[in-house]
């Protein structure tokens, strides 16, 4: 029987094209899928926790919908399930880790744990990683440090999707940066790409069969585009075009700032690790070459950590209580919405797009898993362009 507290068929929203499933249902399903991929139970538990945290936080672009891409990476040979991370350079405050093309989530948890360990001993820990893979949401790893009472930072490069200001060819990844720090009543948690949106967001619009909003993407000739399938195809085929930096594609709107933030991420990931830069990521037959950067800082290196926490919490409260614009009744600080989303989704279910459900059914067919065991009563939309009949 499916482990589903929401109901045997989930809760459907016909207008939005998704169905809600309980956390328990998705957790059970993801664990079995990753074990079928070749990971141990412990490894599967870690990987699925990163993915489902994204879904709980409302970051669906980096949650379950990524599973098919991970499977494709394993099948292609760019993700090596048996690989183990190796420290290749180390000092009391720093380390460089070679991920040997393993699963990004496993490598990244290992790396941030090492950064945390160093920070607790010396006040700061900085770890860079080369030869890894997509690691999910950067914020997961920043939050690991935060949960230990530290200030955490995480970033990664990725397959080139960002077109530099005044350019027409993608040269940088989405290159997200995340920072988390303890505060009350909930921690500060900031996680964003340095592109206007991530590739995962384009994939979600493609699945919803909706045009992209203006100001997100460029076609292969450097012109603005709202065609999600075309932009995605050009990114994969390296034909040109991609996603705009934060600030769009003009200096007057701040494009150079997003471009610059993307470069900062590149510095802390691929450059310090002597790894593969974004423009070459995912161009090899047997690896992606993705690189990461992690940092943990102990507030005790600057004074009384509890006093610092109170000081920060008071400032965050002042921000929330500052004057609101006309028609607005709330100012959020970073991390609030994730707290609220997690509470809502644990209580009322996690939405999964119908086309993602179709992809997962296809995946179950390939892995010889019984899709209906996990999602009893769910009726697949046979007219979906993602349907292969392999389930």
Regions found by a protein language model. Name each.
Residues 2-23, 28-47, 52-53, 60-81, ...:
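Acidic, glycine/proline-rich low-complexity segments that act as flexible tails and inter-domain linkers
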Residues 6-29, 267, 272, 277-391:
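Catalytic-core signal marking the mid-to-C-terminal active-site face
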Residues 62-116:
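Active-site cofactor/substrate anionic-group-binding motifs, chiefly glycine-
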Residues 88-98, 109-125, 225-247:
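Residues forming anionic-ligand binding surfaces in small-molecule and nucleic-acid pockets
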Residues 95-184, 192-193:
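A generic, well-ordered mixed alpha/beta core segment in the N-terminal half of proteins
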Residues 162-236:
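Phosphate/diphosphate-binding glycine-rich loops and adjacent basic-rich segments that engage nucleotide
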Residues 211-281:
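Secondary-shell segments that build the walls of catalytic and ion/ligand-binding clefts
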């Amino acid at each position: 029987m499916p482990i589903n507290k929401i109901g045997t068929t989930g809760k459907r929203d016909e207008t939005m094209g998704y169905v809600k499933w309980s956390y328990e249902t998705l957790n059970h399903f993801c664990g079995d899928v990753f074990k079928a991929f070749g990971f141990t139970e412990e490894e599967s538990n870690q990987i699925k926790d990163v993915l489902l945290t994204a879904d709980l936080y409302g970051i669906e672009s980096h949650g379950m919908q990524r599973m098919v891409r991970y499977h494709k990476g394993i099948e292609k040979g760019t993700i090596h399930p048996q690989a183990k991370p190796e420290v290749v350079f180390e000092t009391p405050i720093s380390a460089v880790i070679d991920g040997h093309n393993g699963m990004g989530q496993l490598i990244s948890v290992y790396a941030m744990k090492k950064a945390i360990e160093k920070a607790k001993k010396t006040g700061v820990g900085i770890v860079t990683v080369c030869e890894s893979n997509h690691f999910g949401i950067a914020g997961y790893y920043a939050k690991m440090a935060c949960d230990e009472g530290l200030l955490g930072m995480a970033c990664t490069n990725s397959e080139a999707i960002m077109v530099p200001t005044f350019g027409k060819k993608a040269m940088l990844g989405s290159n997200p940066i995340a920072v988390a720090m303890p505060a009350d009543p909930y921690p500060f948690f900031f996680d964003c790409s340095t592109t206007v949106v991530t590739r995962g967001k384009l994939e979600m619009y493609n699945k919803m069969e909706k045009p992209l909003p203006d100001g997100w993407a460029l076609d292969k000739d450097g012109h603005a585009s709202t065609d999600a399938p075309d932009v995605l195809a050009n990114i994969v085929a390296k034909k040109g075009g991609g996603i705009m930096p934060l600030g769009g594609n003009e200096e007057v709107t701040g494009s150079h700032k997003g471009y610059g933030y993307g470069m900062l991420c590149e510095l802390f990931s691929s450059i310090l690790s002597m790894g593969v830069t974004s423009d070459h990521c995912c161009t090899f037959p047997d690896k992606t070459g993705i690189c990461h950067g992690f940092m943990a800082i102990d507030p005790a290196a600057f004074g009384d950590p509890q006093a610092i926490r109170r000081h920060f919490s008071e400032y965050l409260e002042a921000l929330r209580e500052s004057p609101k614009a006309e028609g607005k009744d709330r100012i959020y600080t970073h991390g609030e919405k994730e707290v609220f989303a997690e509470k809502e989704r644990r209580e009322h279910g996690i939405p999964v797009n119908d086309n993602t459900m179709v992809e997962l059914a296809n995946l179950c067919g390939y892995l010889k898993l019984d899709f209906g065991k996990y999602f009893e009563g769910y009726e697949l939309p046979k007219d979906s362009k993602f349907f292969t009949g392999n389930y």
